[in-house]
């Protein structure tokens, strides 16, 4: 029955225009997704090549390699895209373009994870997918080309050129939230082959933490709704430790499974002033007081979140260079 005869079919549970609508009848309408970009070799703009690799029936990744010399070993950069747990893709231009340029600038093997999206696949699906993808990357350690004959699920770029002593994990917004939860898990569970995460980047991390500063009604609605959409039955709701890292039952931040961490903050979100400064300040203070033994860097930019991905402004280029310098350890 269509909407002309059944008016209830157009009733929404969530109307987050201009991005996504979720209807009571179960339909999901994604109003904004950037164009799909196919795999390519020797990109004329950057010299980077990329391909899409299945990891399991539910998870895949886009793997990137820059122009390099034979036998050169490169850091491995695993990226988790943001966009509300429910939009975009590793294969679409918005995040793909960023990763492509980042791979060219930093000379890394890039692995951009294609995880399942809410609301079709509610959390913790994305958390599990990204852990599975990270374990897949780690499973390449110690292999050589001879291993490819018996391991059809392995990627030769990672085997031949990946330096597992320089494994980095990064994400933006909800992707940074996934990275945070992955770091917690990596501190408790071993990656395959004993691989360790050297460093991680949280770009505008998505946390919900009560603070003394009240968010405006509109900002609070738009900020918190993506968690409610992605994990409507989360134990504890917005006090679930996966979204509130200082909740009473949250894992100890001292257990982060990496040696270096860069937290990057911005002042604007799509030209709207960001109101999460206090949230991230509480998180950073909690991490500093936790006893975590790693090296923490904080970069606070008077810039819009989107500037990093468009690279159309000098500030966007400055943010890009700051993230790149962390990977280069400059």
From Swiss-Prot:
EC supergroup of this enzyme: isomerase
Active site (record annotation): 173 (proton acceptor), 274, 305 (proton donor/acceptor)
Family statement drawn from the similarity comment of this UniProt entry: Belongs to the 'GDXG' lipolytic enzyme family.
Top-level lineage group: Eukaryota
One Pfam family here: Abhydrolase_3
Pathways involved: Alkaloid biosynthesis
Outcome (variant: residue 204 to F): Strongly reduced activity
Motif Involved in the stabilization of the negatively charged intermediate by the formation of the oxyanion hole in this chain: 81-83
Outcome after substituting residue 274 to A: Normal activity and acquired ability to produce tabersonine
Catalytic reaction(s) noted: dehydrosecodine = catharanthine
Entry-linked InterPro entries: AB_hydrolase_3 (IPR013094), AB_hydrolase_fold (IPR029058), Carboxylest/Gibb_receptor (IPR050466)
Function of the molecule: Component of iboga and aspidosperma monoterpenoid indole alkaloids (MIAs, e.g. tabersonine and catharanthine) biosynthesis pathway from 19E-geissoschizine, psychoactive compounds likely to be used in the treatment of opioid dependence. Catalyzes the conversion of dehydrosecodine to catharanthine.
Main location: cytoplasm
GO function terms (MF aspect): hydrolase activity; isomerase activity
Protein name: Catharanthine synthase
UniProt note: phenotype after gene disruption: Reduced accumulation of catharanthine, increased biosynthesis of vindoline, but normal levels of ajmalicine.
Subcellular location as annotated: Cytoplasm, Cytosol; Nucleus
Source species: Catharanthus roseus
